[in-house]
């Protein structure tokens, strides 16, 4: 049970409880003084159905008010906040912290049950990326699948607002450049995901948006970050996105909280240092801004970017220019 305010008590009434069982639970928690009085009131007022769920009661509530709340089903809702960039692992921990069940149980749904998105993302290997960031109100009686479904529903709503999904039937719009440069020189391990089919366009956009989301929290930079990655895809240059390594290690259960140079060789299709093209799935839940950036990247010839001391990024067209930006960042960090 969650922490309850002073003078208030949580009571969980499970499906199938009889009126007498409900009265006994209320009495044992100090909500009512007499089980018989509650039962008598219930039957004198046409025996209205009492709803299962978790309730938060004031110790001083009247019998009439208590009965009416149960008849209306005024259950208690727990707030679960999902910020932009949360992974399914983060969401699972947030649900557990709210007292709504175990993180492990939520992950079982998020990692395997793709039926919730089968019509819009048939190639998805999990719900990662489609559990939309927002503030949710969940009751204790909701299943993990119902919670996941609420997040997917919000994704669909926002995706329609921005034109990523064109209709309730699931027709999708593409994001980013439509083709790869046919004259580019391939690099090892390039994958077929570089040229998505129409059915893969939404999935590609969500994958790209998730990388953009994890790379920068500065909304106005996101279209530029998107342009860097789309330019690299067109030229068949590996994305080299550090957040993809972190996610690869999260999936493997080996992430220690920090990246080291050796991690760039971590063997996973999600590691965009080792595998060219997009990873096989999103690496986080992108927010609206990141989705829009993935759909509408800036038109640039940038191929590199690095953080600066102010929390923004410096963009570069050549490796020489990029190396100068990296050196400037390191000098700034040493001077702090």
Residue ranges and their predicted role:
Residues 97-101, 115-336:
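Bacterial extracytoplasmic/cell-wall-associated proteins, especially those involved in peptidoglycan
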Residues 1-161, 190:
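Signal peptide-directed extracytoplasmic domains
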